[in-house]
């Protein structure tokens, strides 16, 4: 499975290098990183307050449903949108950047899934 993720990331980066400008790539990567950083920050605030963290169930929300953490959203590339807090997959209107973003989301989701409990 890890080889598949690596292959997807390498292929997407190669395609993005030819199809998109460095500014577009930087903006898309920055947005994706900030989404996963917010998961860490939200979880850290709960722990800092000494509260018992809410039990988030992995893959308990479908695309378009309300969410709080990325790991709640079903789909390898699905993330919890920052502003509306709904599950989404689309990253960019540019198809190459969207593929790059979805690959990056899949990698980030493999890490953030540890914040959610399996059902």
From Swiss-Prot:
Record carries keyword Disulfide bond: yes
State what this protein does: Ion channel inhibitor.
> What name is this protein filed under?
Toxin ICK-11
Q: Does the keyword Signal apply?
A: yes
Q: Which UniProt keywords apply?
A: Disulfide bond, Ion channel impairing toxin, Knottin, Secreted, Signal, Toxin
Please tell me in which tissues this protein is expressed.
Expressed by the venom gland.
Subcellular localization(s) per the UniProt record:
Secreted
> Could you tell me which cysteines form disulfide bridges?
59-74, 67-80, 71-116, 73-87
Report the source organism: Trittame loki
